[in-house]
Amino acid sequence: MKRTKLTDFDSKTRTKIKARDEGCIFCKMLYKMPETYEYGMSGFQIMHYVPRSQGGLGIEENGAVGCIYHHNLLDNGKNTRKEMLELFEEYLKSLYPEWDKKKLMYRKGMSR
């Protein structure tokens, strides 16, 4: 299977992640919430822990729901990425005790 297919969240995986998280994981943590922000007002997206650009797989263990605000902050925020990734990792580890970052990355010859 091609890398692009394996790094994308398919519809089945997206559905499972949305049902599992029930909204933005960072909003639930009240992480850097602007005073004027209303929960979910910007819509929701599925975020990769290991980015697709780095071979991050489109699997449940590599994704979580984020609102557009927090997803943008994770990808483009100044001085927030490290802290957000630590929180993201803690969240995923709480769900998957055997969670291992190395298992989230594409390797040549793998299949879904």
For each feature predicted by the language model, list its residue ranges.
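Short cysteine-rich loop/turn motifs with clustered Cys
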Residues: 8-45, 67-69
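Polybasic, low-complexity binding patches
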Residues: 2-5, 53-64, 72-112
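Catalytic metal-binding/acid-base residues of hydrolase active sites
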Residues: 30, 50, 73
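Short Cys/His-rich Zn2+-coordinating modules
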Residues: 2-12, 46-53
